């Protein structure tokens, strides 16, 4: 079985306040997608994490929407709640900061309902997380992660600006991507091509004038760059005295750096601020052209109203609203 690297990162003491809202009105984009047979659910923003309410095998819970996780995850502490069993493997847990000693488990959720849509026989890996426990637990993560494999399989449209995850139970609908592009570019969005490398989403980027690639990770609270690349890009910064924690490994110290411009594709973010830490070389992909140098996290995706179209492999970003 191949290595599986799970990338959610919790930035201890740096998380932003929660943001919940009532039922949302569908935007022109959402109405267009729903008209093509999509269903889905509203999620909430909690400490810079996108928390999706679900019902798994008849039991209520929530999953963190995580484009950085190649597959969906159920945390070991919630197996009993959902009436799930697990099969053991010899594969060690890999997180953003390296490999841990724990072994992954495998499970399958017979029915996973989200809003007005039900997915059948959703396969997931099982890992431990001491802070799990759903539903919208005030501290820690949720019952698991809704991962990239399911978003690709069901042609998800993830509308972060309007807090909606929409999926098509019959699979991808590539025919709707032209309409999505027309709606969003008219609204001032910039499209950025996504590529999949090693089970992770990558985007081209420029950090402080240095071209690179970033892994797009809604499960990372903040954008983080690897320390070695930060030196190459001549990023300064200061120690925060704070730590970031990933799945399977101990927390790592982080620095904060500011620089004039971060470009994601053709989209420009002025006066960017990022965190810097030592990331796992296996996650980044080594020294090849396809390697990444860090994670594009939830804070910039949220500030710029990100929309993901997993049918065409496109990320849309717009200027920050004043």
Task: For every predicted segment, state its role.
Residues 7-15:
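Bacterial N-terminal signal peptides
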